[in-house]
Structure formats: C-alpha cells, structure tokens
C-alpha cells in the first residue's frame, strides 16, 4: 500500500505548466510540521514536493498561494532523469490525487471551508465536472454575503431571546 496524507502550508505559489499535449501539471512544496519538538522545544518542518495533474492542477494554481493551508492525499513516487552535468538525478515526490483547501481564500471568507478537488476513491480518468463539489444551482446567491452562507443558515440568529426547553430534555 502506498498512501500519503499531508497537511501543511505552501512554501511558494504553485508552478502551473502544460505538457506538449496541453495537459496541466502543477508543482508545489508543502511545509509539514513534525509531530515532535526538538531539544529547544521547537517543532521542525519537512518540505515535501507535490505534483498534481489536469483540472485539479489549474484549481490549485488559481486558489492556493504561498502560505495557504492545504491537505494533500496521494501516493509517493520516485522518478529519475539525467541532469545537465550527465549525472542521474533522483526525485521523490507526492503524486497528489486530491487537494483540500483548508482555509478561506485571502483570509477574507470569500470561500467556504475546504473544497475537495476530487471525489474520494476516484482516479485521474474519473474527474468530476464540478471539482468544488458544490451545487451549480445559483438560486440563493442573492442572499449570500462574503462568508458564502445564506442569512437563514445562522443558528445563533435568535440570540438574546429565551429558549423554550424542558428540564427533562437537558442531559445534565
């Protein structure tokens, strides 16, 4: 089994390129904090190179930037090539199958939560036409503010009014 799950921050903006056949490929590096601290009490980070293909690559390039918090699910792969000096160069990287955006874009709440770039268990050949997993119905967009939530979705909108609940319904 070859499975990698990472959560970290991008060290620089993703690099989006296209193959000669027009297939999009994005590369980026995630800084992932280690689970333990060093002798000085600081948590060190590992810098993991990641690659993602096709429409997901374009989405990553459009919506993530340096410092963005992202979750990556994929597999580890090693490839090699001959460098300019004639020596064999080995590269180990994560081939991302899905990337989740774990914070709002620009910190201003323009986007909601996380966007799953690919349905769970789907392969590259089975990409969703709607990579954000959102309904394309735009009927409620007029009621949305910057947070992306409709005004009726606020569970605390009745703050300050008494709540009618029986003592028998309370768990304590």
UniProtKB/Swiss-Prot annotation:
Residues 125-148 have a biased composition (Low complexity). A motif (Important for interaction with partner proteins) lies at residues 167-172. GO terms for cellular component: nucleoid. It comes from the Bacteria. Residues 1-103 form the SSB domain. GO terms for biological process: DNA recombination; DNA repair; DNA replication. Keywords: DNA damage, DNA recombination, DNA repair, DNA replication, DNA-binding. One of its GO terms (molecular function) is single-stranded DNA binding. Plays an important role in DNA replication, recombination and repair. Binds to ssDNA and to an array of partner proteins to recruit them to their sites of action during DNA metabolism. This is Single-stranded DNA-binding protein. It comes from Bacillus anthracis.
């Amino acid at each position: 089994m070859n499975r990698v799950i990472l959560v970290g921050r991008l060290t620089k903006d993703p690099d989006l390129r296209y193959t000669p056949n027009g297939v999009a490929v994005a590369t980026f590096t995630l800084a992932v904090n280690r689970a333990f601290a060093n002798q000085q009490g600081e948590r060190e980070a590992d810098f993991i190179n990641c690659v993602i293909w096709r429409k997901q690559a374009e989405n990553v390039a459009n919506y993530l930037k340096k410092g963005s918090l992202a979750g990556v699910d994929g597999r580890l792969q090693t490839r090699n090539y001959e460098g300019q000096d004639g020596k064999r160069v080995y590269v180990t990287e994560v081939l991302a199958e899905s990337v989740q955006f774990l914070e709002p874009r620009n910190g201003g709440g323009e986007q909601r939560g996380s966007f799953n770039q690919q349905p769970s268990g789907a392969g590259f050949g089975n990409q969703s036409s709607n990579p954000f997993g959102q309904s394309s119905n735009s009927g409620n967009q007029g009621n949305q503010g910057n947070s992306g939530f409709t005004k009726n979705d606020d569970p605390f909108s009745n703050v300050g009014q008494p709540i009618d609940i029986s003592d028998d319904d309370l768990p304590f």
